[in-house]
Regions:
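Active-site neighborhood of glycoside hydrolase catalytic domains
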Residues: 64-71, 81, 103-234
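Aromatic-lined carbohydrate-binding/catalytic grooves of carbohydrate-active enzymes
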Residues: 3-141, 150, 155
Length: 234
């Protein structure tokens, strides 16, 4: 058993509009308020398709060089030097149509062939098909690369901001299309097993538009839930 850290999340304060100086100033203020952890939320990634709004960049998990020219690692080091731990936001199950990931792997999404892309409506994002072992490897790789390239990250906010619609799989055979829901869950659990095996001591908080995944299966892997998105900056 460990007590959960008191944290400050930058999302409500600046959303997509930030730079390194802004974040470090917020981290210092959070420390002065008594917070133990500073969490960088959405907007830190994407270069060809910068994550400056929710239209683009999701799936391209490399640090945005314009906002953070010295990288995530420098933020971790400076926050740690100020006496506050550092956490980061990921939504590795999702992708925007405006992303290099989708451009390179359009067959990795959940989608009924022959229908229009169903990315309008839930933050303009699509769901990656976790029934596909290649997608499972990619999603694990997002987490693993983020952690190994930025030593000192103590916390992950794992988000999931849309539900499954237009459900179809380019990976599953025709006679297994109705299995996409359960095969997706099994694929996700395989990824989380790998994450927990390699990073057993990392805090992982689950968010899904708030408490949209508040269930025992996910609590097994992520014992902390973001109960509601109905929040403010302070």
């Amino acid at each position: 058993y460990r007590s959960r850290p008191i944290l400050y999340n930058d999302w409500e304060g600046c959303m997509f509009d930030f730079n390194q100086r802004t974040l470090l100033r917020l981290a210092k203020s959070a420390k002065n308020l008594g917070c133990e952890l500073f969490v960088l939320d959405d907007g830190w990634f994407g270069n060809k398709h910068p994550r400056n709004n929710d239209d683009a960049g999701l799936g391209d998990w490399e640090t945005n060089h314009t906002k953070l020219p010295e990288g995530i690692g420098q933020l971790v080091r400076e926050a740690t030097a100020q006496g506050i731990r550092f956490g980061i936001w990921l939504e590795p199950e999702m992708v925007n149509a405006r992303s290099e990931l989708y451009e390179n792997h359009p067959d990795w999404i959940i989608h009924q062939p022959g229908r229009e892309l169903d990315d309008t409506r839930n933050r303009k994002q699509l769901i990656l098909d976790l029934s596909n072992p290649k997608v499972q490897d990619f999603v694990f790789g997002v987490v693993d690369r983020t952690m190994t390239e930025n030593p000192g990250i103590a916390y992950i906010k794992w988000d999931c901001n849309r539900f499954m619609t237009n459900a179809g799989s380019y990976y599953l055979p025709k006679d297994k299309q109705s299995h996409i829901f359960i095969e997706y869950a099994r694929g996700l659990y395989k990824v989380l097993d790998r994450v927990r095996e390699k990073y057993p001591d990392t805090y992982i908080m689950l968010c899904s538009g708030g408490g949209g995944r508040f269930d025992p299966g996910m609590l097994y892997y992520m014992p902390q839930i973001w109960a509601s998105d109905d929040t403010d900056a302070a």
